[in-house]
Each structure stands twice: as C-alpha cells, then as structure tokens.
UniProtKB/Swiss-Prot annotation:
GO molecular function per UniProt: DNA binding; DNA-binding transcription repressor activity, RNA polymerase II-specific; zinc ion binding
Gene: Zfp90
Subunit structure: Interacts (via N- and C-termini) with REST (via zinc-finger DNA-binding domain); the interaction inhibits REST repressor activity.
The protein, known as: Zinc finger protein 90
Cell compartments where the protein resides: Nucleus
Length: 636
C-alpha cells in the first residue's frame, strides 16, 4: 500500500473556486426548486467542511448568496480554470458533454468530504467548461443535477469501503485525468483512508447525531457547527467573520448602504427604483428576485417539493420546511438577550423584544391608540370601519377576527361527528373564506359526552375529563400533611379535615385550607389588603395600576382578568356553554345558569334581614333593599 499523502496543506494555492460547481444565469433558471435545494446543501457543506479543516478559504460570492437566499449564478467570465498545472487534459473536441457532467458529480461529492491533500480531481472544473460548450443552458443545468442525483443512487458503497480510483471508470471520467498524472500530489491520493467519509454521502448515511435535538449530519464539522446553535454562539449561523469585517466597495447612492458584491447592490437598488423584472405568466404579478417568482409559481401549480421526513407534511418553500422541522426537534435558535426566552422564528423574537422596550410604533389614525404589532392595528381598525371579513358558512354570521369565527363554529351541532367512548371529533366542511383565508377550512372539536362542553385542543379536553373522573393528574401515590396515600387513580388524595372536601392537587388543598385558618400571606403594598392566593393579589394590584392586559380582538375592550375577557368574547361569538338540564336553556355565564336553576328547584337563598323575604338572586335582593330604604326616607 502506498504511503499516505503528507498532512501539510497547500493553503495558499487553494481557493473555493477550484472545487465549486457553478451555474450561469441562464442555466440556473432551468433548475427546479428541489434541485436548487440539493445544490445549496452540497455547496454549503463543501465550503463549511473546507473551513473546518483549517484551510484559509475566503468566502466566495456564491456562498454569500446561498446563505442570504439569493440566486447563486455567476457570469461565464468568472468561471476559473484548474489550479494544478501538472494535470493533463484531453483536447476539447474529444470530450463529450456527458463526461463533463459526470465530472461535476464526482467533484461535488468528493471535494466536500476530504482534505485538499486527498483530492485529485479538484482541477476538473476547467474540463467542465469544454463540455458546457456542447450543451444548451437548459440541457446543461438539467444534466448536472440529474446526473448528480442518479449517481448517488447508482454508486452506493459499503460502510467499510473507501473511495479510490476504482470509482473513476464508473463515473465515465476520462482516463486522461488520473491522480497518478499529478506531480504535485502524486500516487498517494489513490489510497487515502480519509476518503471513507465519501461512503457516507453515497450511502446517504449521517452518523453524527446531535444529542439535544437528534438532528443528524454527514460530517463531524457540520455537527460541531450545529451544536453552537444550542450554546448560543453568535457565529453559529455560518457567517464568516473575515467576510463580515471585509471592506464593502459597492455603495447605494440613494441610502448609503454598502455591499460586498455588485450583484447585491443591483438587487438592492430595485427597492428604490421599484423595478420588478420577474413577472408571473399566470397572474402577471412581478417580483424583484427570480427566486421569489419561483416560489410564487408554486402557488399556482400547487407543487410542494419540500416534504418533512417525520410527518410527511409538504411545503412550497425550503425555509418553511426548516421552520416546521423545529417543531419536531424543539430547536429554538433565536434567544432574547434580556430574559433568555427562545423562539423558533426570528419574527417571533422581534415581536417579543417589543414587550421589553414598550415601543408601540403602530398608531390608529382614527383614535390615536397605539399597538406593538401591525396585525393588532389591522384588527383594531376594523372596529372603526365595521369590516367583518370572516363569515360562518353555516349561519352566515360575520366576525371581525378569525379567532372569533373559530370559537363561534364550535357551537354548531355537527351532523356526522366521529364518536368514541370519551369524546367526539367533528369537521366542518371545507368552504372558502373571504380574502383567501383558509385557516378555518378544518375545525376540530373535542366534545365531552358528560356535560356537552366542546374543546378546541385535546390537552384542554383531557384536563376537563379529569374533573368528571376525579383522576389524580400526577398518576402516582402522594401524601400531604399526614393525609393517606393515593390508593386508586380516581381518588382525590388530599382531603380537608375540617369540611371533608377532597382535592386532586396539594396546591389546591393548601389554598382551600386557608379558608378555615384565615391565613392570608399575600399582602398588597399599596393598601395593605391581604389575600389567601397569589393570583388574587395579582388581580387586586391591577385596580391600583389600572392595567388591563386582556384585550378583546373584536372591539378592543380591555379587562383586568382573563376570565372577564372570556365571558365578554361570548357576546361576539354567541357561545353559551352552560345549558340547563331541565329545560335546555343555555347561558354565557355559570352564575346565570345557577340563578336560572333555582327557578326549577324553588331555592331562594338570599333573605332580607328587614322583612325576612327570600329571593333566588342576589340582584333581586339588592333591588328589594331599595324599597326599605325609600320607605325609611319617606317616614323621616
């Protein structure tokens, strides 16, 4: 076996252009969305792997474009020839287009997964140019990507094998280009054990797995870079510090903003000029970037090329897939520097940061009220215009906000619900909504067969079921203050020794016990009033501060308690969840149901101390007291 190549890296002579796969603008426009995603993943891994191996590789423009989501094509004159002068080449006329495409495949897969000293085919890019001249732009771009995909499937190698020159004939690469022809690196390149990494990409293996989110990678360097996201490393987004600190020569004459590349300046200037050169052939809508046009065209075709491997959900944009996958991995890379809270989306972090600054930049022109979010302002403006774009497909009632319609639709009886022992699952037919809103085309409701209450989420429904079952949510034997341990999962282990009332949770029992002891550990600093519960103190303090954090999205009315907001929202949705078992009459508030039930039972718990007359409602007793007050005034 030939000795391994020297470990010294010829850093000064290596640039990323020597190992890159490049497209012209015309070729790039013939590449589909899924193929563009494949190209982006391979190129970024190529660059990141070279940097992780210690090579002084300056960030090229194509990588900068890929990281920014821009189009990575370059002009013909920018495509470079091979850097190694010792490699022999065949005359251009004797080389077929297919051979050039095959070379693209080998270079794409090999160069990004080994050290530069182990790669013999970094110089074949110059040969690709001769093959490119034989192909049109569409054929050239399609052959590059298609051959790349096919060869990955056809040339899978075993786990213990390594890539050597035996693979070269399979890829139809000209025999005039061999590692033995290179006097700079020599024959040592044929027997490099580090090429075993190549088997991972051909076999689609990702042996390096993140312990926190279980995401897998082909290279250890990619894993190391990913782990910085969890650690909060400020340079974990793949930004090259050297490029960041480099000079920006291209300045916008309108706003003074500078850019590293002229193409970036050209695209930026379209913001000022309003130029949108890329127009949709279907609807005529124009865009500043061709990538935006490609994403828009998917809306017409319905194509969703980006599919989640875990749940199968498909998306039109790769960025949407990346954001969706964070739901499965739990990754929240955007962290607030003030409170440490993390978010899956950068927009969510931006909206959250406003809560710290208190800034409300969006102001209503009608009444002057300010909001921290643009969406909140849009919702508020409907209270002035009276616009109600969300209409119920069953009864025709319209609402100003989509959540109000969502809540309203739960009150309708479902014709064919899915029944189970504990709940019903129902769907509202798929009906179009105004302004293209499709979020309400499918409404799921969990219906309790014991009390008839509906829930929008399975977690809320499960919690509600415990009220009927008396189930201990902890699911284990617990004791509190000498109480007996839980002997059955449906028992309430925490029982009050004074009144005998039992509770599922120890915290509920402790709060209840303060009723008997009179303990009120939570005291208001303003007026000195004390409370037995912390939540009661929090609500009381709002009477001093005037804070009303719970705002109705329909009319803008604010409340100091969330329960008050819930009751108020029912005036908009028409929901009446509390139904009388005797006559079927429904009510918005539980207290109204209790008052009504006394008309059936005849109970009158409110007695007048003056005359002894009894009433079923406290409000009726209050009115009655006024009669005695007037009589006393008349007598005096």
């Amino acid at each position: 076996m030939a000795p391994r190549p020297p470990t010294a890296k010829p850093q000064e002579s290596v640039t990323f252009k020597d190992v890159a796969v490049n497209f012209t603008q015309e070729e790039w426009h013939h590449v589909g969305p899924a193929q563009r995603s494949l190209y982006r993943d391979v190129m970024l891994e190529n660059y990141n792997h070279l940097v992780s191996l210690g090579y002084q590789v300056s960030k090229p423009e194509v990588i900068f474009k890929l990281e920014q989501g821009e189009e990575p094509w370059i002009s013909e004159k920018e495509i470079q020839r091979p850097f190694c002068p010792d490699w022999k080449t065949r005359p251009e006329s004797s080389r077929s287009p297919q051979q050039g495409v095959s070379e693209v495949f080998l270079r794409t897969n090999v160069l990004s997964h080994t050290t530069i000293g182990d790669i013999w085919n970094v110089a074949i890019q110059g040969h690709q140019e001769s093959g490119r001249r034989h192909l049109g732009p569409e054929a050239s771009s399609q052959k590059k990507i298609t051959t790349l995909e096919k060869k990955i499937e056809q040339n899978k190698v075993g786990e213990d094998s390594s890539l050597s020159t035996d693979l070269v004939p399979q890829l139809d690469i000209s025999s005039s280009i061999r590692p033995s022809d290179c006097k700079t690196f020599g024959n040592n390149l044929e027997h490099n054990s580090e090429l075993v990494t190549q088997s991972n990409i051909l076999a689609k293996k990702k042996p390096y797995k993140c312990d926190k989110c279980r995401k897998s990678f082909i290279h250890r360097s990619s894993l190391n870079k990913h782990e910085k996201i969890h650690k909060g490393d400020p340079y974990s987004n793949g930004t090259d510090q050297g490029a960041q600190s480099g000079r920006k020569h291209h300045e916008c004459a309108d706003c003074g903003k500078t850019f590293l590349w002229r193409t970036q300046l050209t695209e930026h200037q379209r913001i000022h000029t309003g130029e949108k050169p890329f127009e949709c052939n279907v609807c005529g809508k124009a865009f500043r970037h061709s990538s935006s046009l490609g994403q828009h065209e998917n809306a017409h075709t319905g194509e969703k090329p980006y599919q989640c491997s875990l749940c199968g959900k498909a998306f039109q944009r790769s960025s949407s897939l990346v954001q969706h996958q964070r739901i499965h991995t739990g990754e929240k890379p955007y962290r607030c520097n003030l409170c440490g809270r993390s978010f899956r989306h950068s927009t969510s972090l931006t909206q959250h940061e406003v809560t710290h600054s208190g800034e409300k930049p969006f102001q209503c022109k009608e009444c002057g009220k300010a909001f921290s979010r643009c969406s909140s302002l849009v919702q508020h403006e409907r209270t002035h215009t009276g616009e109600k774009p969300f209409e119920c497909s069953i009864c025709g009632r319209a609402f100003g906000q989509s959540p109000s319609l969502y809540k309203h639709m739960r009150i309708h009886k479902r014709s064919k619900p899915y029944q189970s022992n504990n709940f019903s699952l129902a769907f509202v037919p798929n009906t179009p909504l105004p302004q293209g809103e499709g979020l309400l085309t499918e409404v799921k409701s969990y219906h309790c067969n014991d009390c008839g209450k509906d829930f929008g989420h399975i977690t809320d429904f499960s919690e509600h079921q415990r009220l009927h079952a008396g189930e201990n949510s902890y699911g284990s034997e617990q004791t509190l203050l000498g109480q007996q341990s839980l002997s059955h999962p449906r028992e309430k282990p925490y029982q009050c020794n004074v009144c005998g009332k039992a509770f599922k949770r120890s915290t509920s029992f402790i709060e209840h016990h303060r009723i008997h002891t009179g303990e009120k550990p939570y005291e208001c600093n303003e007026c000195g009033e004390a409370f037995s519960r912390l939540s009661s103190l929090t609500q009381h303090e709002r009477t001093h501060t005037g804070e009303k954090p719970y705002e109705c999205i329909d009319c803008g009315k604010a409340f100091s308690q969330s329960s008050s907001l819930i009751q108020h929202e029912r005036t908009h949705t028409g929901e009446k969840p509390y139904e009388c078992n005797e006559c079927g009459r429904a009510f918005r508030k539980k207290t109204n149901l209790h008052d009504h039930q006394r008309t059936h039972t005849g109970e009158k718990p409110y007695a007048c101390k003056e005359c002894g007359r009894n009433f079923s409602r406290s409000s009726a007793l209050t009115k009655h007291h006024r009669v005695h007050a007037r009589n006393k005034l008349q007598e005096s």
